[in-house]
From Swiss-Prot:
Residues 71-262 are lumenal. One of its GO terms (biological process) is negative regulation of amyloid precursor protein biosynthetic process. The lineage of its organism: Eukaryota, Metazoa, Chordata, Craniata, Vertebrata. Plays a role in the induction of neurite outgrowth. This is Integral membrane protein 2B. It is found in: Golgi apparatus membrane; Cell membrane; Endosome membrane. Keywords: Cell membrane, Disulfide bond, Endosome, Glycoprotein, Golgi apparatus, Membrane, Signal-anchor, Transmembrane, Transmembrane helix. Residues 1-49 are cytoplasmic.
């Protein structure tokens, strides 16, 4: 018996292709380097590390400052705002005692918006344009933590700063109790008017040193220091100087603040 076998042409072709693949060689240029031979200089690594450290430090500082600002901003926004007023007698040293005198007395009214932040020890007063009195609208900040008072005369768009007078300005907690009583109707104040006179002195260049709340009030405004004259009760003769008048209250009596330039 004779065994006959045939060689497949396709099998020969596949074997030839495998040999060609095995014989392929990667040819690199003479100046090329192997990937594992590439080394980053130490100076570049160090510079990159410093950049990362400074970047993280700036980001952390921004987060801290931004958080502090947002806390004060939202604390300011969340404080309750009261719209209150008191009646006062302008042409007398005290309230009349008899009923006849009480009816004939000429009462004036001060109305204003008030906001108190007890935790920060700050009072905000906004005096609108009065209907009949010849006084200026104003925004006032009493900062008990900084022991400063700031007046923003809205007619002049100027700021004035003076040490806080705690003898006439109620502390935030007591003032808040007074406002709650006024709102509840248990205390309807009928009071008198106190006069105080301030003299404009030096200009303040850096309002950022006056604390967050006064900075918020006075930034971008011309800001001046004030010097207080002794508070006077009743009608007083005044010198012929250029004065602006602000009527407000932060106690059981009304206050007329004269801001004068000599």
């Amino acid at each position: 018996m004779v065994k006959v076998s045939f060689n497949s042409a396709l099998a020969h072709k596949e074997a030839a292709n495998k040999e060609e693949e095995n014989s392929q060689v990667l040819i690199l240029p003479p100046d090329a380097k192997e990937p594992e031979d590439v080394v980053v200089p130490a100076g570049h690594k160090r510079a990159w590390c410093w950049c990362m450290c400074f970047g993280l430090a700036f980001m952390l500082a921004g987060v801290i400052l931004g958080g502090a600002y947002l806390y004060k901003y939202f604390a300011f926004q969340q404080g309750g705002v009261y719209f209150c007023g008191i009646k006062y007698i302008e042409d007398g040293l005290s309230l009349p005692e008899s009923g006849a005198q009480l009816k004939s007395a000429r009462y004036h009214t001060i109305e204003q918006n008030i906001q108190i932040l007890e935790e920060e020890d700050v009072e905000f007063i906004s005096v609108p344009v009065p209907e009949f009195a010849d006084s200026d609208p104003a925004d006032i900040v009493h900062d008990f933590h900084r022991r400063l008072t700031a007046y923003l005369d809205l007619s002049l768009d100027k700021c004035y700063v003076i040490p806080l007078n705690t003898s006439v300005v109620m502390p935030p907690k007591n003032f808040l109790e007074l406002l709650i009583n006024i709102k509840a109707g248990t205390y309807l104040p009928q009071s008198y008017l106190i006069h105080e006179q301030m003299i404009v002195t030096d200009r303040i260049e850096n309002v950022d040193q006056l604390g967050f709340f006064i900075y918020r009030l006075c930034r971008g405004k011309e800001t001046y220091k004030l010097q207080r004259k002794e508070a006077m009760k009743g009608i007083q003769k005044r010198e012929a100087v250029n004065c602006r008048k602000i009527r407000h209250f932060e106690n059981r009596f009304a206050m007329e603040t004269l801001i004068c330039e000599q």
